[in-house]
């Protein structure tokens, strides 16, 4: 009976997470979440979104998630949710596409639980296995996203204030990187996420400048205030029941030792040390609050595991049915708190004028982050030659009558480099470095 329940839970997690990604409600990849508004607001087509999702997620699945899962015999959540991001975005944004994504996600979840090693072995058959290198594509997105408030300030209030915001953002990041570990006791520490804290600092400064914007203080402006952040959270709140179910399923799966949220708690859970695994997961979740909350508020897209407290619940509650209920309640509380934060942000004068600049700044940042990530991945696959191909791809795309959107060039270029590397290897024209 327990074995059947395990397969039911993993299938449900895979199916629902794929559907959430397909409908652009929630994605797990922190690097993909800021990209989704580009698709939702029609600045990116479905093909470019699918290619970006694959490029920034699949390498992490193969190079990080699967090997770690095999070592512990417990699935690292990245294996499931990074792949469901890809499944969801690759299926059409239609009713049939939604159903297809759910079916494929369920099958993938069951297959993942059934045999992890087979998947890795298949990709190891490639002459040049470049999938691990594709993880470089998303290496800078989370970091780069932290600078978008500074770009917004520069666009709206001038370069000088933008520089001030950028400098403070950088200082906060470095301070957290240096002093961001808070010891709970001799064995446990809370490690604050430096990029999340930097993003939070930048947003606070952006809101301070917006509050000081006199043009936004008149009565008519306030009456016509566009609820930018509240509208984003309202979109998340609309889907709160299905997000709650998603959180509950993840908590139940963690409770049954099917999955874990990070390698440290995964290892402790494999050893049967649920309490320390829970404390470790709690410390990680606290550190990631700013990153998940701020990206949710600014994009209108949530994470399937929320702020990751559902893993703590699953680890500390051994009964999967109770964990299911508690996990669902946890996600509801998180979303309600997001709404409170968003309504508070909307009261700041000047936010209305920030709207277009926020969107423009996010596009700027993601464009350059994905291009640099593509270059890093290409260089990892084929040093120097990879850079040549990416630059050529970028320039030729610019000259095309129907160019690809800029943010798709880096990820697609990295995939192209990987394919070219394998073809050249078969033609005896390329030998990868040892």
Regions found by a protein language model. Name each.
Residues 1-53, 79-299, 312-434:
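Signature of multi-pass transmembrane helix bundles
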Residues 55-90:
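Glycine-rich, N-terminal phosphate-binding loop and its surrounding beta-alpha-beta segment
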Residues 304-308:
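Conserved structured catalytic cores and adjacent interaction surfaces
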């Amino acid at each position: 009976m327990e074995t059947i329940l395990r397969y039911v839970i993993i299938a449900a997690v895979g199916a629902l997470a794929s559907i959430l990604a397909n409908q652009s409600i929630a994605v797990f990849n922190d690097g993909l979440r800021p990209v989704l508004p580009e698709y939702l607001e029609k600045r990116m087509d479905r093909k470019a979104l699918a290619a970006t999702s694959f490029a920034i997620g699949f390498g992490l699945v193969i190079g990080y998630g699967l090997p770690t899962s095999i070592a512990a015999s417990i699935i690292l959540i990245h294996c499931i949710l990074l792949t469901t991001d890809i499944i969801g975005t690759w299926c059409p944004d239609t009713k049939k596409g939604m159903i297809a994504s759910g079916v494929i996600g369920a099958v993938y979840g069951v297959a993942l639980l059934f045999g992890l090693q087979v998947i890795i072995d298949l990709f190891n058959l490639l002459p040049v296995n470049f999938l691990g290198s594709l993880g470089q594509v998303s290496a800078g997105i989370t970091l780069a996203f932290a600078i978008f408030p500074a770009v917004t300030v520069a666009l709206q209030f001038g370069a000088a204030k933008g520089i001030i915001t950028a400098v403070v953002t950088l200082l906060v990041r470095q301070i957290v990187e240096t002093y961001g570990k808070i010891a709970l006791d001799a064995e446990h520490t809370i490690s604050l996420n430096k990029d999340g804290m930097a993003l939070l600092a930048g947003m606070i400064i952006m809101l301070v400048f917006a509050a000081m914007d006199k043009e936004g203080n008149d009565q008519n402006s306030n009456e016509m205030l566009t609820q930018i952040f509240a509208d984003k959270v309202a979109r998340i709140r609309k889907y709160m029941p299905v997000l709650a179910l998603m959180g509950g399923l993840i908590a139940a799966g963690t409770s049954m030792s099917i999955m874990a949220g990070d390698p440290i708690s995964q290892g402790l859970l494999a050893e049967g040390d649920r309490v320390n695994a829970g404390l470790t997961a709690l410390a990680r979740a606290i550190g990631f609050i700013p990153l998940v909350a701020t990206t949710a508020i600014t994009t209108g897209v949530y994470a399937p595991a929320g702020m990751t407290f559902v893993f703590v619940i699953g680890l500390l509650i051994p009964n999967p049915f109770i964990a299911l209920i508690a996990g669902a309640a946890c996600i509801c509380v998180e979303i309600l708190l997001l709404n409170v934060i968003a309504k508070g942000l909307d009261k700041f004068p000047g936010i209305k004028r920030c709207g277009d600049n926020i969107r423009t700044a996010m596009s700027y940042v993601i464009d350059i982050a994905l291009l640099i990530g593509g270059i890093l991945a290409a260089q990892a696959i084929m040093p120097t030659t990879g850079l040549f191909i990416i630059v050529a791809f970028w320039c030729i795309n610019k000259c095309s009558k129907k160019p690809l959107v800029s943010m798709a060039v880096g990820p697609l270029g990295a995939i192209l480099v990987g394919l070219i590397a394998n073809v050249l290897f078969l033609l005896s024209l390329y030998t990868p470095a040892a």
